[in-house]
Regions:
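N-terminal flexible segment immediately upstream of the FAD-binding catalytic core
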Residues: 1-63, 80-109, 260-270, 318-342, ...
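N-terminal accessory segments
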Residues: 1-38, 67-70, 303-320, 409-414, ...
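Activity-critical C-terminal alpha-helical subdomain
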Residues: 178, 425-462
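C-terminal substrate-recognition/cap domain of FAD-linked oxidoreductases
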Residues: 22-33, 218, 229, 237-402, ...
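Short, ordered loop/turn segments at secondary-structure junctions
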Residues: 76-79, 99, 138, 255-258, ...
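FAD-binding subdomain of flavoenzyme oxidoreductases
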Residues: 101-105, 109-254, 453
Length: 462
């Protein structure tokens, strides 16, 4: 163990003996996240796991880390896809799992959630008060702190935005141990610089989010899901554009093809219920008034048919909607074992069709399958580069970079919701420039003078 025994003893005095884990097998589960194996960094095993139970304990742990110049890696639910939680140097894994309280202030439609609370728990607690947290950025086992740190998005970002849009206030422990309390329960707050949003999307390099005030909404009374099949991608994208520019704002607008969605259904032991078509749009609608929902359903059906769709499948039944969404949501899991890397490219709305056609050109060039699906409603498209037989690691990275270039040529970016983490850091200087890098280094230097917090992430090496 590279960490001094005196540090370990002081950590035990701070959080309690049972919350400091040094046994190798127990530490193992804290060394990885969901990053695809082909691009995942190799973790170090010289790690101690510390589980604080309060903001005050987080503060004391960080003060000790500075005293001993020990590296600290923040651990949420382990659902990240870019290696952001993987320890790459000896140090402390700071797991926030004990800090999982959620309090709903129903009168003000605000949730006060600790960083270790899961997305699923937040949704469940809100529903007890006939309220909802509309965002659904993927895995419900993800921790609130991690979702904020990564500014997570997901399929429902079309109607209600990404995590940043919900954050009213934060409690943050700076790398040196000082505690910042930012924002309030109010919708509007123009008192001083909005430092809270400096930490949203900061990926754990500037501070540790320990608590958040999150905006909730009245629960939508009526929902419907309509899956529209097409015999060509062109017709699907024409319909998507038509819907987006009509003024209709769906809760979600998703694209996928038959091969991808049937792989997910098979993985779940289910059957995809739509027999026609090879390309699909899935439109999820949610409204307070049933009459409005019916008008929207009619419009989606009409607009799709005008663009040459096949027979749409619409349902208001809760069980059927959940099944459709479950199959869509498990695409990543179904493909995971064969995946070298999952890309998170995002392009302007009007260029989604051009981008996917460019990806299909790359697929044909290499004679491989590039599974494509995603949030067509906000331009965020996921592509899996698989472990193709006969391809070296360098060749697989080359395929990924061809896809990145296709997105960049259309004015897009290489990540829309997963973040930079460890695995995308090598592209930062080229894509964001020297001034961005130097500005971030200066900011990091002010907040984290001893460079203890989440090293090897986001900011390129000097």
């Amino acid at each position: 163990m590279a960490l001094p025994i005196s540090l370990i003893n002081e950590l035990k005095s701070t959080v309690g003996d049972q919350w400091v884990i040094i046994e190798e097998k127990a530490v193992e589960r804290y060394l990885y996240d969901e990053t695809a194996y082909g691009v995942r960094p190799q973790p170090v095993r010289d790690i101690v796991v510390v589980k604080p139970g309060s903001t005050e304990e987080v503060s004391e742990v960080l003060k000790l880390a500075n005293k001993y110049k020990a590296k600290v890696y923040i651990r949420g639910g382990g659902t990240g896809l870019v290696g952001g939680a993987i320890p790459t140097k000896p140090g402390i894994v700071l797991s926030l799992e004990r800090m999982d309280k959620v309090h709903v202030d129903s009168e003000n439609m605000v949730a006060e959630a600790e960083a270790g609370a899961t997305l699923g728990k937040l949704i469940e607690e809100a529903e007890k008060h006939n309220l909802m947290f509309p965002a659904h950025p993927g895995d419900e086992g993800a921790f609130i702190g991690g979702l904020i740190a990564c500014n997570a998005g997901g399929s429902r970002a079309v109607k209600t935005g990404v995590m940043r849009n919900y954050v009213l206030g934060l409690e943050v422990v700076l790398p040196t141990g000082e505690v910042l309390k930012l924002g309030a329960k109010t919708i509007k707050n123009n008192f001083g610089y909005n430092l809270a949003h400096l930490f949203v999307g900061s990926e754990g390099v500037l501070g540790v989010v320990t608590k958040a005030y999150l905006r909730l909404y009245p629960k939508w009374s009526y929902t419907a899901t309509i899956v529209v099949p097409f015999d060509s991608r062109v017709k699907a994208f024409k319909t998507a554009k038509k819907l987006l520019f009509s003024g209709l704002i769906p809760l979600a607008l998703e694209y996928f093809d038959r091969r991808v969605i049937e792989a997910s259904a098979k993985h779940l032991g289910l059957q995809w219920p739509i027999m026609e078509g090879d390309y699909f749009l899935m439109v999820i609608l949610a409204e307070a008034l049933e009459d409005v929902l019916f008008l929207e359903l009619e419009y989606v059906d009409k607009a799709a048919r005008e663009e040459g769709s096949l027979e749409p499948f619409a349902t208001q039944r809760t069980d059927e909607q959940k099944t459709l969404l479950k199959i869509r949501s498990e695409i990543f899991t179904a493909l995971k074992k064969d995946t070298f890397d999952i890309l998170d490219t995002t392009v302007p709305l009007g260029s989604v069709d051009k981008f996917i056609e460019a990806v299909m050109d790359i697929e044909r060039k290499h004679g491989v399958w590039l599974p494509v699906y995603g949030h067509v409603g906000d331009g965020n498209i996921h592509i899996h580069v698989l472990n193709y037989q006969g391809y070296t690691r360098e060749q697989l990275i080359g395929v990924s970079e061809e896809i990145y270039e296709a997105a960049l040529k259309l004015g897009g970016v290489i990540t829309g919701e997963h973040g930079i983490g460890y695995i995308r850091r090598k592209y930062v200087r080229r894509l964001l420039g020297d001034v961005w890098v130097e500005t971030m280094r200066k900011l990091k230097g002010i907040l984290d003078p001893n460079k203890v917090l989440n090293p090897d992430k986001v900011i390129p090496e000097e």
